[in-house]
Amino acid sequence: MDNNNNNNNQQPPPTSVYPPGSAVTTVIPPPPSGSASIVTGGGATYHHLLQQQQQQLQMFWTYQRQEIEQVNDFKNHQLPLARIKKIMKADEDVRMISAEAPILFAKACELFILELTIRSWLHAEENKRRTLQKNDIAAAITRTDIFDFLVDIVPREEIKEEEDAASALGGGGMVAPAASGVPYYYPPMGQPAVPGGMMIGRPAMDPSGVYAQPPSQAWQSVWQNSAGGGDDVSYGSGGSSGHGNLDSQG
């Protein structure tokens, strides 16, 4: 009996089904190829689009700073100083206005209009449109913190409807713009410019003498309509009636 018990206790262990030295691995089936690629591709497209927009805005402000530092003509302006003065005097507490104040206000209004236009145009490009609409301006105001004082006058319903429509299509409202439809703001000739893009022109200067390349046809039509449609506002760099000297507008 004792020998039998010893033999039973000394039985060899069962042979492993795996070869010696091999590691046991669990085979996990790969995820569906469609869903992962869509998520990754969409995130990359969105990130690339944000980088493009930030680059365009940085170029715009870099050029504006350079232009402000080099300005030496304080008599001709993009916006009529008479209108600026009239708005400033609408405040009953304002009794007198110095000669420099309307000039600074005119430049500030010009920069405000230009930046808001650029941001609105970017939204139009995201939605693959070549026409600037009021919902593009509303979207630019809603997206930008410094424009939050205009939120109360933004048609929020139109933005919500557009975002819902984009979400239903699976685009999330962000579509990569075409390579030829990216609005770049080009510096004057003689300064480095980023090639391969369009630009947002300025109405008060001759594009052939200022920009490295002529503006796009879309922006040409916008500026031409603005220049020909106003009653009092004149978009000329010369001494037109819309921008008179400070002496003549006092």
From Swiss-Prot:
It comes from the Eukaryota. It is found in: Nucleus. GO terms for biological process: abscisic acid-activated signaling pathway; gibberellic acid mediated signaling pathway; negative regulation of starch metabolic process; positive regulation of photomorphogenesis; positive regulation of protein metabolic process; regulation of gene expression; regulation of long-day photoperiodism, flowering; regulation of seed germination. The keyword Transcription applies. SUPFAM superfamilies: Histone-fold. Residues 1-35, 209-250 are annotated as: Disordered. One of its GO terms (cellular component) is plastid. Belongs to the NFYC/HAP5 subunit family. Stimulates the transcription of various genes by recognizing and binding to a CCAAT motif in promoters. Involved in the abscisic acid (ABA) signaling pathway. This is Nuclear transcription factor Y subunit C-4. It comes from Arabidopsis thaliana (Mouse-ear cress).
